[in-house]
Amino acid sequence: MVNIIMVLYSIFLFLPAFIANPGAVITGGHFILDRGKTIHGKRILGDGKSLSGFIGGSLIGVLAGIIVYYIIYISNIGLGNYGNNIISALPVLFAMSFGSLTGDITGSFIKRRLGMKRGAKGSLLDQWPFVLMSFLFIFIFARHFFLEFYGNFIAIILILVLTPPLHRGVNILGYKLKMKDVPW
């Protein structure tokens, strides 16, 4: 039987992956990853993917995870955490955050191959690659955590369902705050 509280808790634990993406928008813009290079006349990634955004966004995700870790630790919820201590939590947080932005970059790469320009609405290509790559990184680098919180796949499915409206809302906010050129 599925424990709904554990499923919701697992979604809460995924916050670093969600926060890494807007963190990349805040810190991005310096040292464009593809340096303007093309494949068959199409940009590899585009100007929206930068080293400063990748590293800065990932570190913001890790920082968010450290905050979540201590909230859980202090509140003594008893449902588990990223690790037994902050040091053992770091591989999970790094895998989740860097995986998230690796997925975002992968989505951009696919969009460019399909001929979609930067800022073009890519629907699920804008929304799911960061989630899926984050889970892949967690599975590879923190398998014990993955199996404990996402092994039954129900939380993964719910995160995939919740991501499109959440992603849209965050992008609208970024657009209204003049941090994004388009609201998607």
From Swiss-Prot:
One of its GO terms (molecular function) is CDP-2,3-bis-(O-geranylgeranyl)-sn-glycerol synthase activity. It is found in: Cell membrane. Pathway: Membrane lipid metabolism; glycerophospholipid metabolism. It is a multi-pass membrane protein. It catalyses: 2,3-bis-O-(geranylgeranyl)-sn-glycerol 1-phosphate + CTP + H(+) = CDP-2,3-bis-O-(geranylgeranyl)-sn-glycerol + diphosphate. The keyword Magnesium applies. It comes from the Archaea. One of its GO terms (cellular component) is plasma membrane. Its EC number is 2.7.7.67. Pfam families: CarS-like (PF01864). Its cofactor is Mg(2+). Keywords: Cell membrane, Lipid biosynthesis, Lipid metabolism, Magnesium, Membrane, Phospholipid biosynthesis, Phospholipid metabolism, Transferase, Transmembrane, Transmembrane helix. One of its GO terms (biological process) is glycerophospholipid biosynthetic process. The chain crosses the membrane at residues 4-24, 54-74, 86-106, 122-142, 145-165. Its main location: membrane. The keyword Transmembrane helix applies. Catalyzes the formation of CDP-2,3-bis-(O-geranylgeranyl)-sn-glycerol (CDP-archaeol) from 2,3-bis-(O-geranylgeranyl)-sn-glycerol 1-phosphate (DGGGP) and CTP. This reaction is the third ether-bond-formation step in the biosynthesis of archaeal membrane lipids. Belongs to the CDP-archaeol synthase family. PANTHER family: CDP-ARCHAEOL SYNTHASE. This is CDP-archaeol synthase.
